[in-house]
UniProtKB/Swiss-Prot annotation:
Keywords: Endonuclease, Hydrolase, Intron homing, Nuclease. GO terms for molecular function: endonuclease activity. One of its GO terms (biological process) is intron homing. Its EC number is 3.1.-.-. This is Intron-associated endonuclease 3. InterPro entries: His-Me_finger_sf, HNH_nuc. The gene is ITEVIIIR. This endonuclease is specific to the nrdB gene splice junction and is involved in intron homing.
């Protein structure tokens, strides 16, 4: 029988503190298998935590602190101490590690690995965003990504410049049924003919198009308009020069976003 139920049957409902947190049932001898009533003690959650902290039982402290709703930093520190206090780091034993890796690979191959559906990551990321600790929200990360994207756009290697990544992503979403084109709401606003073209791969957005100048291959009218007209080998493409930083041969979008009135050099004079 559950030790909490044993205590409740003998003493009634477990009381709550002023914050509405249910008190804890502590095993006096530290043996969770010994559920004798004389071995069970009802304590506040703070008292329970203090006992295990004094005993340097960091694993128990970590579990209790999660229930106490402490800050992520405090919980992380305790989790680290709990891991380091274990006599045997079982996951570092070569045989165990090899077995776990083989199991994960097998699950990935047969599609049963729990991280493949994305639901766990989605909830984890939403929680981190709510707490303000997601790496996308950190100034250092934002600056690094911005710098990398600027360089990629200038070199013409940014994923948005070629369309290959978007094309593969859209095809994947269509195949697994998660594309918004296939949602019930979108179906009400989209003709059956369009949906049929998407399913059989004949939609204009799925049609492969080759740049007339450099031979680069992309998909959809958008690729032709954005790449063909702006291709560096197109002699008739619009070329703009920034009057502040002397950068030349800029596309309209790059000029509008990073140069002209928005150029950093303009404010350094």
């Amino acid at each position: 029988m559950n030790y909490r139920k044993i205590w409740i049957d003998a003493n009634g409902p477990i009381p709550k503190d002023s914050d509405g947190r249910t008190d804890e049932i502590h095993h006096k001898d530290g043996n969770r298998e010994n559920n004798d009533l004389d071995n069970l003690m009802c304590l506040s959650i703070q008292e329970h935590y203090d006992i295990h902290l004094a005993q340097k039982d960091y694993q128990a402290c970590h579990a209790i602190k999660l229930r106490m709703k402490y800050s992520p930093e405090e919980i992380s520190e305790l989790a680290s101490k709990a891991a380091k206090s274990r006599e045997i780091q079982i996951f570092n034993i070569p045989e165990v590690r090899a077995k776990n890796i083989a199991s994960i690979k097998s699950k990935i191959e047969n599609g049963t690995f729990h991280l493949l559906d994305g639901e766990i990551q989605r909830k984890s990321n939403l929680n981190r965003v709510a707490l303000g600790i997601h790496n996308f929200q950190q100034a250092e990360h934002i600056a690094k990504v911005k710098e990398r994207n600027i360089a990629a756009i200038k070199e013409g290697t940014h994923v948005f410049c070629g369309g290959k990544m978007q094309s593969e992503t859209q095809s994947k979403r269509v195949n697994d049924g998660s594309h918004h084109f296939l949602s019930e709401d979108h179906k009400k606003r989209t003709s059956a003919k369009t949906l049929e073209m998407v399913k059989n791969g004949t939609h204009p957005a799925q049609k492969e198009i080759t740049c007339d100048f450099c031979g680069h291959i992309g998909k959809g009218p958008g690729f032709y308009l954005k790449h063909n007209d702006r291709c560096k080998l197109n002699p008739n493409r619009i070329q703009l020069n920034c009057p502040y930083c002397d950068k030349k041969d800029l596309s309209p979008s790059t000029y509008k976003r990073w140069h002209g009135d928005n150029c950093k050099a303009r404010f350094n004079d």
